[in-house]
Amino acid sequence: HTVASELKHYTGYGNPIGGLNCAPTTMGRHDVFSYCMPVFEEAFVKAGATDTMCSYNSIDGFPVVSDHEILTDVLRGTYKMPGFVRSDMTAIIMQHTAHHSAATPKEALQKAVKAGVDVQFADYSHEEYRRLMKEMLADGSITMEELDTSTARVLRVKDMLGLFENPYVDETLES
């Protein structure tokens, strides 16, 4: 394999309240599981999609980025997704700034990691992300096992793509 397919936006995105980007979805959990999830199931189970970008919306008031059932139980348990979960742009910090489901940026990150998010996308500067991860490891908010598992998911995709054997691009190919 030389290409990994990353599906987005997992899940329930596309029907936001008032048509506003990032707004909670108008669909309840039952509708999301009935109408949205089967599409992702087909993509992971039958088509072999590798990883996903989770959406920044909430379903019934619960942000997808911190939903363990959706990101871990279903995605990795039922669908057997082999890769990683990337947060959509600012999805993690939105738990603090928009959804108000996390009291602090640190709590927002902890909830995302615990739910199964492996890669953050523009939520924190690299310095702040490293600082918060170190703090959470030190105070027990997350475990080294959780961090190792998350890191292994990212490395697994890189290994599947052969990036450890030949990390170069054939520059003679046209895009």
Predicted regions and their residues:
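Glycoside hydrolase catalytic-domain context in secreted enzymes
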Residues: H1-S175
